[in-house]
């Protein structure tokens, strides 16, 4: 959906949707007959959830996504910022120090460096340690919110194995889903500075989105305190997918959520003037 209004317009006008293509073919994830943990009735479903970031450091925004399959992959942009062209999907690779991890209920095994985790949960691409390289933050195979750090090895960017360094104020690792199989995953997440204090906060799907205020880093762990939902209105069907935008250009992150009814919901940040 192209924004036709330009910057600093609180209620933009949008162009008609255009289907994304990867390797010149319409991009669509489908489970196929055995790709969904909930069975073949979902053969044509995709459950895609994504982040936009310059994953490879070439100055162009790429797409990093998860889906019904639990395979975290990316679409490299080989076009321009105004006319993107996407390559075919390729796996996000982890420099595992042993066998690649997978959910216990998966009937198939990942390849040597492949990143496989719980389905239907956002791969949040964010430079958490502020070293200039985007990291990956998302649920691991057991539902904990974990940190995949980017690093350099032999002159190339790599992704290190996950560590559970996102915790509550008591230092207990954040676990956003302890259920298994079809009930696993299903958590939509974004990271931002919601209250403007310079610390990274977290928004997690709920009736709209739950706010976890960042308390900073202590003894190697990032601490977050749950503060409740952003608003009273319930827009949830299954999951609300939260992100932040600044349509009006005031420098303050506002809430944008995609809901199961197919609509986008926008809410102005309370600290915005």
Model-derived regions: residue spans:
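A structural feature that tracks compact, well-ordered secondary-structure segments
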Residues: 1-3, 53, 66, 75-77, ...
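Blade-edge motifs of beta-propeller repeat domains
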Residues: 4-45, 78-118, 151-184, 215-241, ...
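Hydrophobic strand positions within the blades of repeat-based beta-sheet folds
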Residues: 50, 63, 74-77, 123, ...
């Amino acid at each position: 959906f192209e924004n036709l209004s330009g910057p600093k317009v609180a209620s933009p006008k949008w162009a008609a949707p255009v289907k994304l293509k990867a390797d010149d073919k319409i991009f669509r994830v489908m489970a196929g007959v055995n790709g969904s943990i909930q069975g073949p009735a979902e053969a044509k479903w995709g459950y895609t959830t994504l982040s936009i970031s310059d994953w490879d450091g070439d100055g162009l925004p790429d797409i990093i996504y998860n889906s019904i399959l639990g395979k975290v992959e990316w679409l490299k942009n080989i076009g321009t910022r105004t006319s993107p062209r996407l390559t075919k999907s390729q796996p996000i690779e982890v420099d595992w120090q042993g066998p690649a991890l997978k959910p216990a209920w998966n009937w198939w095994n990942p390849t040597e460096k492949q990143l496989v985790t719980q389905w239907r949960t956002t791969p949040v691409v964010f430079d958490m340690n502020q070293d200039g390289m985007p990291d990956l933050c998302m649920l691991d195979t057991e539902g904990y919110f974990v940190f995949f750090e980017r690093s350099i090895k032999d002159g190339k960017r790599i992704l290190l194995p996950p560590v559970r360094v996102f915790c509550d104020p008591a230092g207990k690792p954040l676990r956003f889903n302890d259920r298994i199989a079809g009930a696993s995953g299903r958590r939509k997440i974004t990271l931002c500075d919601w209250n403007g204090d310079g610390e990274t906060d977290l928004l997690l799907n709920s009736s709209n989105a739950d706010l976890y205020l960042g308390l900073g880093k202590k003894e190697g762990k990032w601490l977050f305190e749950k503060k409740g939902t952003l608003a009273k209105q319930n827009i949830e069907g299954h999951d609300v997918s939260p992100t932040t935008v600044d349509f009006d250009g005031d420098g303050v992150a506002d809430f944008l959520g995609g809901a199961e009814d197919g609509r986008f919901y926008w809410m102005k940040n309370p600290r915005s003037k």
